[in-house]
């Protein structure tokens, strides 16, 4: 006898949802007020990325690669990255300088589940703690939910990486826990902290970003009046 298709009223199950897959990420160009995101191209971006990233070796402390001894080894690494579809790599252009100043990727791509992760984020010192850096995260989240059609957007990091954990909360990701002994990176143990944002949360997160970016949220010196973390209501828990 085949199992019944009927489910007992006493047995809790998930709600039924549309099973159409999400789109896969690919080449794109998204222009913001402070930053532009475009597909990583070693010919266009290698030189300015190297100049942006070469002096701060701490950028690579929690990564599975880097730091790089010279521009040649960095360029070889970029060449290897751009042939991959997962992760799919993008360059971050600082509109103020028109120079590539960082890299982000979309990775762990599962279209059937409509789940995707943002990761491998490397911002040069000139991009860190700027409105451009925050705008990149807004533009990527908007693209993931509104263009690609994902229902879950993930952020994962080494559990020891306190700045990344703070950034995830500030941006509106919810802390979900730690996977112990999850990976071995550069010969060292990595416990991984997991964060997520889901499609039902995105309208409120989007509104928080847009309120934060509003000109009236910054004084004449450029200092924020209300923090993005406060607007998101996620200032603890990870």
Residue ranges and their predicted role:
Residues 1-130, 143, 147, 188-193, ...:
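GNAT-family acyltransferases
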Residues 133:
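Glycine-rich acyl-CoA binding loop
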Residues 140:
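Flexible ATP-lid and adjacent glycine-rich G1/G2 motifs of the Bergerat
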Residues 146-156:
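Conserved GNAT acetyl-CoA-binding A-motif
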Residues 155-164:
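Conserved beta-strand-loop-alpha-helix junction that forms the acyl-donor binding cleft
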Residues 167-168, 195:
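Conserved active-site tyrosine of GNAT-family acetyltransferases
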Residues 174-188:
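Conserved catalytic-core motifs of GNAT/GCN5-like acyltransferases
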